[in-house]
Amino acid sequence: MVHNGEVTENFGDARERWNEIAPLVSSAQAAYHSGDEPIVTDEHYDRLVRELRSLEAEHPELAVDSSPAQSVGAPAAAGFENVAHLERLYSLQDVFTLDDLKEWYEGTAGAARCTAEVKIDGLAVNLRYVGGELAVGATRGDGVTGEDVTANIRTISSVPRSLKGDFPDVVEIRGEVFIPLAEFDGFNARQRAAGLKEFANPRNAAAGSLRQKDPKAAAERPLDFIAHGAGRIDGASSAVDEKLASQKGLYELFEEWGVPVSPYARLVSSWDDVEGFVREYADLRSDLIHGIDGAVFKIDSRAEQEDLGATSRVPRWAVAYKYPPEEVETRLLDIKVQVGRTGRVTPFAVMKPVTVAGSTVAQATLHNPSEVARKGVLIGDVVVVRKAGDVIPEVLGPVSALR
């Protein structure tokens, strides 16, 4: 190891920065996977994770096993039994520019045929069927062990208790639990009327709902499910094995078994197809049945998937392109407060109506009084507005140059 002043100083700075942001990333991951209120925005979280990985790439000494940049999810929460997955669940490699997506497609993927899918903004789960019967439903957890939420999974009408047709002896079906966008406002209104916690976005609502201690309470939540992958598969017939040769064939099997799959998926076989899919669903994202935060591409050949394998965190045969949030400017007309049944005061902005992420908004949350002070917004300001998770309008801050 080189011990000159510059390298030592750089490593010291890197370690100091790592120590500053790693705990924040860990806390954000725990909140994300537990359904608690987010402590940072998705975009801020993505930036922190990218910075953490960059620090660890430049200084491998920082890439310890406990680093949140090396993790897949979060440990199982207290209050639920742990359950081991038969095969590990991985995260996905994220890219944030079309150039990086093209590099993956033409490089790693070798411009192979891929499935193109939207990235559902939900809670990842693993469903284990034994003899065609739902035996275990678990959250992703850390990828090796998750939370046993079988009783709550059984309350989701779109999750079949029994598979149909020609199914394997054992199969793990991976997918996302979500609350449909059309159901979210009504769900939050019922929460508000009952004096219960409202959720910032559908994903948090889904995560919180799936972790209800009482399955009857979970059954009252408008949860839905879509499958997007498989883990362990044992005892499949030759006909099933033939279809398992491709990702497309896997999805066809899911449909034959009575398992819901995404209506927003298709095969792509050129860069133009890939880019076209990204742009198409960037325009349609507010019109889908569920929230999305990106587009996912998977090499269609499962033999090629096997050959490429995975890192300790992500498969090399798949990638997720993350969409940036839509941000618009409008005039802040007033700041008002809403007092909840528990006495909690929530300030909100009254604005000149503006269209953002597919709908017209005239009010936006300011979260709490300290956030108003931190953002420094004043009545009469031109402010930047976006929808958190593409659902909840929020004011990011003023356009100070226009004051």
Which sequence ranges carry the predicted segments?
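RNA/tRNA-interacting regions in translation and RNA-turnover enzymes
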Residues: 2-403
